[in-house]
Design a protein with these regions (language model features):
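Conserved alpha/beta-hydrolase catalytic His-Asp/Glu region
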Residues: 141-189
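Conserved HGGG/HGGXW glycine-rich cap/lid loop of the alpha/beta-hydrolase fold
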Residues: 5-49, 72
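Post-His helix in hydrolase/transferase enzymes
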Residues: 235-249
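Flexible "cap/lid" loop of the alpha/beta hydrolase fold
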Residues: 92, 96-98, 102-140, 179-180
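Conserved alpha/beta-hydrolase "nucleophile elbow" surrounding the catalytic nucleophile
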Residues: 14-16, 75-84, 201
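Conserved serine/cysteine hydrolase catalytic core
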Residues: 170-234, 238
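Active-site loop/oxyanion-hole signature of alpha/beta-hydrolase fold enzymes
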Residues: 36, 42-78, 89-93, 116-121
Length: 254
């Protein structure tokens, strides 16, 4: 790719219990705007043979490096929800290939910090900060957790139409706890140099808006954009989100 050519390849990282399907409504909008979308299925989410007990950040990074190798050029990484932690680590490890990171209601945290720490802090005074946690069903060995459809509709998809919410809730899969209990290890010289944007979901019931604001204070420097949606704007408002993503990328790569 010539230096003057814009970066058009988007690596899209889903959150817990989800898969590449989570981006299905958004991808055509982004492709119409000239982007090439690479929605991934993270190891251990039910689309490969990775055992839940084997999931780790190292396995995630090895998989994503393969994705980047296949693309063969610079990329923009988009992380939704817990996919934000993975996006941060990918930026750290592949700082030359990752040209910017976008967080969509994403977990943008300090080096070594887990999202559970933020939840523990906020839930002292606001039980709603627990988000989906009280609704989780655990496997007997507690290696995986599952979100039941009713809980998904209430916490993740409350602003989606009933058909959309029901369809998405049925697609959720057991998620490895070792892939949820992760933290990125970041440095100022690598991750810290990558331009970032944070797209807030102001009506989010999973990652409350005030928690999103706290993360932006903890890890300052991201350009802020907002959308009046719940936790999954890519499903509830794909047209509006695609426009915001386009503006965010243009602003980051100017």
């Amino acid at each position: 790719m010539k230096a003057s050519e814009p970066v058009r390849d988007l690596v899209m990282i889903h959150g817990a219990w989800q898969g590449s399907w989570a981006w299905a409504a958004l991808i055509p909008k982004l492709e119409a705007a000239g982007f090439r979308c690479h929605a991934v299925d993270m190891p251990g989410n039910g689309h490969d043979r990775t055992r839940p007990e084997d999931v780790s950040m190292a396995i995630y990074m090895a998989y994503l490096r393969g994705v980047l190798d296949g693309i063969g050029g610079p990329v923009i990484v988009i992380g939704h929800s817990s996919g934000g932690i993975i996006a941060s680590q990918l930026g750290e490890e592949e700082a030359k290939r990752v040209k910017s990171i976008l967080y969509i209601a994403g977990m943008m945290l300090l080096s070594g910090m887990k999202f559970a720490e933020l939840v523990a802090d906020f839930s002292k005074n606001d039980p709603a900060a627990l988000g989906i946690v009280p609704y989780l069903a655990w496997s007997r060995d507690r290696e995986t957790s599952t979100v039941k459809p009713g809980a998904a509709r209430k916490i993740f998809y409350q602003d989606c139409s009933n058909p959309k919410a029901n369809a998405a809730a049925k697609l959720l899969r057991p998620h490895p706890e070792r892939g949820r209990d992760i933290a990125a290890r970041l440095t100022k010289g690598r991750f810290g140099r990558i331009p970032r944007a944070f797209i807030e979901a102001r009506l989010d019931q999973s990652v409350l808006h005030k928690m999103q604001r706290r993360m932006q204070k903890l890890v300052p420097g991201a350009h802020r954009y907002s959308i009046d949606s719940g936790h999954a704007p890519q499903l509830a408002q794909p047209d509006a989100l695609a426009k915001i993503i386009g503006r965010a990328i243009a602003g980051l790569l100017d």
